[in-house]
Amino acid sequence: MNTDRLSQKNICDGDFKKRSDVHIARKVWHMTGVFTLFLGWTFFPNYVSLILLAIAWVVFVPADLIRLYNPKLNKTITKWFKPIMRNNELDRPAGTTYLLTGVIFIGLLFPPSVVALSLLFLAFADPIASYIGIRYGRSKIFGHKSWQGFFAAFLVCFVLTFGFLYFRGISESIWIVSLIAGFIGAMAELVPIAKIDDNFTMPVMSSVGLSFVFTFFSIFEHLK
């Protein structure tokens, strides 16, 4: 990191929210954006969703990476997105870069039903667990993660899975599948992987776990 980027960070980061802040605007942006991806994955053909995601990736990600080496561009972009940015993103790729990359990754590797449910986990379990953990997380597991946030993520993922399967006419093993999926989503939200942003790791880990569960309980056969 060069001195221009360091000095810019020192000047600006006090004006931006930290990870430990509730940051409602960011959570609303996150839920709205990821839920929109879910709707696209649900109502558009898989290849159309991937094309639209690829276009969004090409528009956003290169600019996000270039700004890290161009102080003037970085200052302009961070000023535009200040309401939804964190201070640690001033000199690192934004969460949206990891999110778009992660969704394209799972979209290429996993069935649409798994991708759709993983997007629901990311849209709602992640911000709700974060909110509960920040406001009420007195029992820490490690770092900023708490048991309160973990159980919030579990409950949200359980409810989302139950609703996802129920409205697709699947009742067989719905309770046990939903309970296991809730645990998978909560673990995906909890466990850090080599300091990679959870906007990438959560959908990937959720998709891996859900694929195993859906295969074991023959859920894919009912989703055809």
Show which residues each predicted segment covers.
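Interhelical loop and helix-boundary elements at the membrane-water interface
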Residues: N2-L52, L65-F167, E172-F216, F220-L223
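Central hydrophobic cores of alpha-helical transmembrane segments in multi-pass inner-membrane proteins
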Residues: V58-P62
